[in-house]
Amino acid sequence: MAGAAALRRSARRVVRPGAYALSRALQHPERLLSSQASPDRGGVLGSELGRYPPERVRNFSIIAHVDHGKSTLADRLLELTGTIKKGHGQPQYLDKLQVERERGITVKAQTATMFYRHANNQLPASDQPDAPSYLLNLIDTPGHVDFSYEVSRSLAACQGALLVVDAAQGVQAQTIANFYLAFESNLSIIPVINKIDQPTADPDNVKAQLKRLFDIDPSEALLTSAKTGQGLSQVLPAVIERIPSPPGKCDSPVRMLLLDSYYDEYKGVICHVAVVDGALHKGDKIASAATGRTYEVLDVGIMHPELTPTGVLYTGQVGYVISGMRSTKEARIGDTLHQAKSIVEPLPGFKPARHMVFSGLYPADGSDFDALSHAIEKLTCNDASVSVTKETSTALGMGFRCGFLGLLHMDVFHQRLEQEHGAQVISTIPTVPYIFEYGDGSKVQVENPAALASNPGKRIAACWEPTVIATIIIPKVLRLPNRFFSQRALLKYRLPLREIIVDFYNELKSITSGYATFDYEDSEYQQSDLVKMDILLNGQPVDAMATIVHNQKAQRVGRELVDKLKKFIERQMFEITIQAAVGSKVIARETLSAMRKNVLAKCYGGDITRKKKLLEKQKEGKKRMKRVGSVDIPQEAFHELLKVSNSK
């Protein structure tokens, strides 16, 4: 009995992790509002959030070209405000996905709430205890062209943006694209020239580029080094002074924009929202403008930088909501969540993503179809820019036809399926959406080449393919024609999308020694001479390998395809014929010889007819195997087919 009593006393002394830090923070909430790092990080009371009317809230994002220092700058701002401790945690704190850390790129936009005390005069805020404190919502965005949709969704929750430019590399292709995304969203743009500590840094040249390309006053640019901390003290004051506060009506019924969502095994769907009007409290009833379904708010809070419950969110603030959504289909990105039983005008939402690359995803083992379906459903909750439809292949069985924003987007999605959900996936050759017109005047958009049936009764009269406007920036270090007198050349071309989705970017980097940068934007469809190419194994078409190519390149591409397949398909006990065909015409062929068992090994001399009988029997057996046998196509073969270039 004494032991049991001691156990009960011990149990009463158990404190949940973080509870002590939370209680200390709640006793001293002013420490959360310091412009210096605080030793105590904890929760934030809803009553404390009430001290931040929209006039003292700033929502801003960081946009830049790849590898110009966005994530490092975000780390320094989190440290400067005491949101994370200096030297604690991992670099690029907001890059939380494994794929982001392995590739060194930002894939998902991440939000963090910071508290910062700022005075509107020249005295430091630390010397003015009555200086007003501000709530700052920082959104770190991706820089690669394939994730521009992620950037545009993040900007919808912001009123301003930090445009980060490398002091050595200057304005790059994606810098231009991101600037116009922010400009079209009517955001206040603060130029930040980063990496000024580099030996090759030339801030004056970058200022001149900003003036020439964007008409930005050079005096507005901030000179910083996120690595050394130089100049960072001027960034947050500029955010507060130059970026307007979020608009909204505090006394109206609550209205929120659903920015993003992801699935948690225990909590269900966690939604990231921006409160446009009113206030959201735990226990409130909210409804979806898209589905009409009603939910109860089970938890609400901010990202500080992890999920921190507050019990309330006020006008202009960005945070998370857990409302008991169990299906990822209920959380529609861009949806308006509002107070139940109230009539509100839905928010504009987002433009639907335009999918540029399509690929089939199939489970490596046909019995894993349900597991793959479940994994894709969870992942698309966190990546709303992917389209998914079910399809069936005679070669690979049940699978999915998925639409992506680009080849890197597709590659990252595959990697996340494997790393986060343990799915083993076979992916087919990526294609782009084509438009075909038949002789009777009917048109059809083809996203899967296998769906383009070879119907002799319906003659294809014309076909169109999507094009893009490509922007290529070449610096002075490369030898340019004499007509280019400036520090760099900005080249614009109209290119077929199919030509750039595979290896155009890598080839451009190769021939320019890595100096050129590349970006593209969607353009119109253009008429072209296209044909469907089928791959046949032993005379049977493999629908998962069908592709659409330009007619003049069909023979070369067909030859490359069959050559690669011959290298990666394992030899069988029967002969395998690999063919590439356009319609009924075979344009390339390779033969994979059969493995041969030495059936004469046990014959030592003797009558020759005995040997002939054994050889004839083996020959008949191979014919029978070829007739009923199936050819196993390894995943490596599909990967190699992706590398077949259409641009040479």
Swiss-Prot record:
Alphabetical keyword list: GTP-binding, Hydrolase, Membrane, Mitochondrion, Mitochondrion inner membrane, Nucleotide-binding, Protein biosynthesis
SUPFAM superfamilies, per database record: EF-G C-terminal domain-like, P-loop containing nucleoside triphosphate hydrolases, Translation proteins
One GO process term, biological-process aspect: translation
Cellular-component GO terms for this entry: mitochondrial inner membrane; mitochondrial matrix
Membrane topology of this protein: Peripheral membrane protein
Residue ranges annotated for the tr-type G domain, each copy included: 55-247
Pfam families with a match to the protein in the record: EFG_C, GTP_EFTU, GTP_EFTU_D2, LepA_C
UniProt subcellular location: Mitochondrion inner membrane
EC number of the protein: 3.6.5.-
Recorded GO MF terms: GTP binding; GTPase activity; mitochondrial ribosome binding
Catalysis performed (reactions): GTP + H2O = GDP + phosphate + H(+)
Residues where GTP binds: 64-71, 140-144, 194-197
Main location: mitochondrion
The keyword Ligase appears for this protein: no
Described function: Promotes mitochondrial protein synthesis. May act as a fidelity factor of the translation reaction, by catalyzing a one-codon backward translocation of tRNAs on improperly translocated ribosomes. Binds to mitochondrial ribosomes in a GTP-dependent manner.
Miscellaneous section: This protein may be expected to contain an N-terminal transit peptide but none has been predicted.
Family stated for the protein in its record: Belongs to the TRAFAC class translation factor GTPase superfamily. Classic translation factor GTPase family. LepA subfamily.
Protein name as catalogued: Translation factor GUF1 homolog, mitochondrial
